[in-house]
Amino acid sequence: MLFSSLTFVWFFLPALALIYYISPGRKLKNGVLLMASLVFYSWGEPRYVVLVVLSILLNYGFGLALDGCGERKGLKKAVFILSILVNLGLLGYFKYFNFFLELAMSLLGRQGFAPRDIALPIGISFYTFQSISYLADTFRGENPAQRNVFRLALYISLFPQILSGPIVKYHELEPQIGDRQESLSMHAYGIKRFVYGLVKKMVFANMFGQVVDRMFDLPLEQLGTVTVWLAVILYSFQIYYDFSGYSDMAIGLDRMFGFTYKENFNYPYLSASVSEFWRRWHISLSTWFRQYLYIPLGGNRKGLARTCVNLFLVFLATGLWHGASMNFICWGVYYGILIVAERLWIGRILEKNPLKFLNHLYTLGEVAVGWLLFRVDTLHNGKILLKAMLIPSKGLWNPRIFADNRILFLLVLAVVFCGPIQQLMPRLKARLFDEENITAADVAVMAALLLLGTLLMVSSTYQAFIYFRF
């Protein structure tokens, strides 16, 4: 079930809100949310809800085992390592088994490899990382093991974030499961954020996505420089509005039920370096890797060389987390090299550069190349398109075939709303994210935007969120 579907917006969500708010007591409300989360997940993946339940039970048992080790550090560490291996093993089987087996067969020179029919369960990368957060926090003693299996189940499976995040660390969410306060203003703000996200998805992401798909389906050798740049720019905005729209919807949904999440995006296309871009893009994933991989590897505490190695490994893991293909591995390597280069010397050049707008152009150019690697089906296709981006060529297709006046108008709006207007008009930004004062004008705007989103849902074809693949 998609957040941007008529079934969810006009049936599932209103029914859940009604049942939730008439349910007395925190335990019953949590029970309603847990059942709704499992129903929500099973709506699209009925067979894999069993995997979610298995993950919950396994991690519940591992948490109790960690707690039961007491001061026996060796045993506790062994249990923790085993728990991580089990979680990564489940993720690895469903997400990486065919990729690594095919890679091994290729290296051994064996032909005729027939991959297994293994479907990727939606959201497995996200709820696996949340489970690891629980285990790591318990192992470190930052929180005791959760002895109520239903509360742990709610943390792992809470429906707003189970499919595509944000990835919420256990020590941030667990206190809210037991003690949170709902209010009319929180619910109203949640609706506002949800509607913002819905419009991002339906108006910008889906519209751009239709054009991008048409362009990438063409014979790539026929695309000229301007056309390729147009495709990459449109995809850059498609993925931003798609994923930030989902995050807005998830944050809004959780706010309706009394939860508070940290922001997952902070206007990444305003960044003046690639390092800054990754502090603003998919913040929950970046902070997860920082806390649970970069710092345990030594962070920046063991000298410059070790810091650079750790940074590179984090981005290699980031690429692999996104998908089982050489594209994503190379995408991670690409960013790893850029981040290390900025740490070694490019960062100093950017700091001393008096023409700061050039820093932004540098960042946007590097990010555009990154999105090209992210979008193409094969590295060979990426090589063809990268050559077209860098070496001027006319191509066989007129860019105006794809960028009609409607798309160009939306592109201008996309540029404005991805950051500049909030920077130039701070009062408007404050109004958009005001949680306390919901005025009649706000209600009217939200109603109009919800109507627009509904009309687009009725008339549009199915387009899943991009990050559902991961």
Regions picked out by a protein language model, each given a short descriptive name:
Residues M1-R469:
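Membrane-embedded transmembrane alpha-helical bundles that form the catalytic cores
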